[in-house]
Amino acid sequence: MKKILLSTIIATAAVTVAVAQQNDQRLNKAITDATWYHKALKSAPSFRDLLKRRKNAVEQFRAIPTEALRPITIRAFATAEQRAGTRHVIIREHEYLNDSGYNNGGFDLGIGTPDHVISAIAGDLIDSYVTQAALKGIDIDSLGINIKQTGPSLQDWGLKYTIYIDSPASDSQLEELRLLAEQNSPLYQFSIRAHKVNTELVYTRSADELVLPPTYQPGLREFIEWETRKGEGNRKLRESGKRPDKSKFGGYAYDYPYSRANQFTPAQTDSYLSPDGPSAFINPSSGVTVLQVRHHRVLQDHPLYLGGNDLGPTAVESHIGLLGSCFTHVAEGTAARTKTPLDTLNVSLTAQFDPRAGRKGFEQTPLYPTDIKMRVFISSPRPEAEIRELVEKTEKGCPIYNLVTNAQVISGRIERVTARNK
């Protein structure tokens, strides 16, 4: 019996090693053999395959009885990560970091919130193009989007996007597709309207002096103090005509470039996507939307009941989460400028989203999120009245808060390209 068991173990190990070696050979061939790579690329699911899957998914969703659907409460949570100051966003089981570039005092650990929210809008738009093309029977071989902010103020973002598309459809069909995509994009429709954000402060008074064990690590209070010293030092150097030195203020990397440019371009969207600005593309194999800003990438996806794989938050969830992320970032800066010590800074957000929008009896129901509520949790040794004033200043200076509370103008155009893998 022992001999049989030993033989089985040896045989299993041999098969495992053989499979691993075969996979290594395939990987090496994919890396070194251009012909093999292009053959594999052409055998991968195409954009037209994605359109077929998307149409089936929409039809299956439409087959769900309206009475079986209910409004959804979107929940997101954002926190300022103590001594790093980065913003950590959690949406269901998904999470991501937002951070500033080096020249804005951050560590470039993630996309900055303004770029992230713009790319989230772009991702929702391009996803809407896919859905409407699938329903209209418009073939697409490649699709990508660039978007940029051209507006002059926090209240006026002036968003402009360019859709890069390879399609046999006529110009008039593509123009009709553009209009349908905008009409059915939740974030496009959300952004062109002004919304109220109901803000509630949950205040906790913390000790004036922190008394902690010797192993204590610097926290948010120390980060705010560091931000204050850095800001004051930079102001003095600017006033004297000198440029801030990266060796000062705790190693502040002011002289570093914003970040390295993105060198990667997806196979089916080619180099027309901007390497530096916010962009998005759809992965034909999974249908997931990939947001890209420089070398950072974040996924947006649909839940299973909408034909997705739930590999990331939805575009609507991302937008709500980014409101909290941006608020925490601006609150950090406001606290630093006003020399207000903070010990914790967390934001909890909810919004309502109704999947019945557009169905019979729900024609007037918005397809975008409504009833946005934001609870701001702050602990500080300063009195509550001072913290309430800080929250009000943060609202006025928060880019995404102003994006949400002011109606925006978004314009788009279509540019034809040729898919790289044809």
Would you name each region that the model predicts?
Residues 21-119, 131-321, 332-422:
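Extended beta-strand/beta-hairpin segments
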